[in-house]
């Protein structure tokens, strides 16, 4: 997969406090994987490389609204999210209480996300981009290749990978710009994710490899 800023974009999933900050409710399950992968630092390196070399950046966020409590059924992790009010917002147009909450961006990422150039798409409602406008936004900008990272490795990142491939995009996953829960009953999600990345993605890169490819691209 050839990476070039004319047709390749960075897509980060859920760069939010809930899954990246010590204040996030799942921190006890995530902190080991985040530290082992150096996830936050690696995501920031990719942000910096993208901004310095004119790659478009897209954010696919995760939010839950009070009306979503009317859902009649949920999967295991969805149930945990609802029970613990993860990614909670007060309303679609209500920003009250957002700043500093689990749904807010990780503070160190805000300069990159809020620079007026990053495209924040509508929220994905479960795991994948089937329920938001990511694919539309990518196509409208002539993007056919994606550098993918963010959270969680085995859930939203993998779901975005699968759907983007189905939609005809080439996708490179940056394996150390993501992390996953170490769950006492369900297992280590990162191990499952790596196996599936190897089967599905057009490339599985380290952050070093991704940054090298981005910084050596010809404008």
What are these regions (language model features)?
Residues 1-9, 18-19, 48, 52-53, ...:
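Active-site-adjacent betaalpha module
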Residues 60-63, 151:
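Short, well-ordered beta-to-alpha junction loops that form the rim of enzyme active sites
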Residues 65-69:
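Short catalytic/ligand-binding loop motif for oxyanion handling, primarily in non-cytosolic enzymes
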Residues 6-8, 23-50, 54-61:
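A short alpha/beta connector and helix-capping loop motif
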Residues 13-15:
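N-terminal nucleotide-binding beta1-loop-alpha1 segment
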């Amino acid at each position: 997969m050839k990476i070039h800023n004319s047709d390749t974009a960075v897509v980060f999933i859920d760069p939010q406090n809930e899954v990246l900050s010590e204040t996030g409710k799942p921190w006890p399950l995530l902190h080991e994987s985040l530290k082992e992968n150096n996830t936050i630092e690696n995501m920031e390196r990719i942000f910096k490389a993208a901004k310095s070399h004119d790659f478009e950046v897209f954010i696919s966020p995760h939010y839950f609204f009070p009306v979503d409590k009317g859902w009649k059924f949920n999967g295991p992790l969805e149930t945990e999210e609802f029970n613990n009010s993860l990614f909670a917002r007060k309303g679609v147009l209500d920003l009250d209480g957002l700043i500093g909450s689990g749904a807010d961006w990780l503070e160190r990422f805000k300069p990159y996300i809020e620079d007026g150039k990053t495209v924040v798409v509508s929220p994905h409602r479960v795991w994948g981009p089937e329920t938001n406008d990511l694919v539309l936004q990518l196509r409208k900008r002539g993007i056919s290749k994606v550098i993918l990272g963010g959270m969680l490795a085995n859930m939203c990142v993998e779901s975005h990978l699968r759907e983007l491939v189905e939609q005809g995009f080439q996708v490179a996953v940056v394996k150390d710009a993501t992390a996953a829960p170490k769950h006492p009953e369900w297992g280590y999600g990162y191990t499952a994710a790596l196996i599936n990345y190897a089967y599905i993605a057009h490339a599985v890169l380290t952050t070093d490899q991704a940054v090298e490819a981005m910084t050596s691209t010809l404008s």
